Amino acid sequence: MNEAATVLGTADIQEILRLLPHRYPFLLVDRIIEIDDDNSAIGIKNVTANEPHFTGHFPEKPIMPGVLLIEGMAQTAGAICARKTGIGSNLVYFMTIDNARFRKPVVPGDRVEFHVVKQKQRGNIWKFHCDAKVDGQLVAEADIGAMIVSKEDA
């Protein structure tokens, strides 16, 4: 972990609940193990068989829906934005998704790492490249955009 990440530390579930408005069953980040200022982060999702989406996707062979992998990436990016711009004073809106690719299925028992790297920022618009990995292997990737807005203006 580099020096900037050490300064900002990690985020356990209690910190994530302060950073993000999402709650069960839509909170898709269990922990953030590394934050490098507003440049990058690694979020963790422990996938369990008890998650509600597995009852229909698919009952005989449960696979985590790709859209939820994208949402986990967006939540990890959102935590970076919220931590940098002021916890509780702003909302982070998911704006764009480009170049999404799904490489391998994610199943119960997997530990997904969401690697999020800020590519650029212009005003209140932030762009990120995101990779989702299981056991070091790429399972999904996407470029996403987020907009930061004041809660008063939302």
From Swiss-Prot:
Keywords noted in UniProt: Cytoplasm, Lipid A biosynthesis, Lipid biosynthesis, Lipid metabolism, Lyase
Top enzyme class: lyase
Gene name per UniProt: fabZ
The organism of origin for this protein: Rhizobium meliloti (strain 1021)
Main location: cytoplasm
GO MF annotation: an example: (3R)-hydroxyacyl-[acyl-carrier-protein] dehydratase activity
Biological role: Involved in unsaturated fatty acids biosynthesis. Catalyzes the dehydration of short chain beta-hydroxyacyl-ACPs and long chain saturated and unsaturated beta-hydroxyacyl-ACPs.
Family to which the UniProt record says this protein belongs: Belongs to the thioester dehydratase family. FabZ subfamily.
Reaction(s) catalysed (UniProt annotation): a (3R)-hydroxyacyl-[ACP] = a (2E)-enoyl-[ACP] + H2O
Top-rank taxon: Bacteria
Active site: 57
Official protein name in the record: 3-hydroxyacyl-[acyl-carrier-protein] dehydratase FabZ
Stored PANTHER family: 3-HYDROXYACYL-[ACYL-CARRIER-PROTEIN] DEHYDRATASE
EC number per UniProt: 4.2.1.59
Alphabetized SUPFAM superfamilies for the sequence: Thioesterase/thiol ester dehydrase-isomerase
Biological process terms in GO annotation: fatty acid biosynthetic process; lipid A biosynthetic process
Subcellular location(s) of the protein: Cytoplasm
Gene Ontology CC terms: cytoplasm; membrane
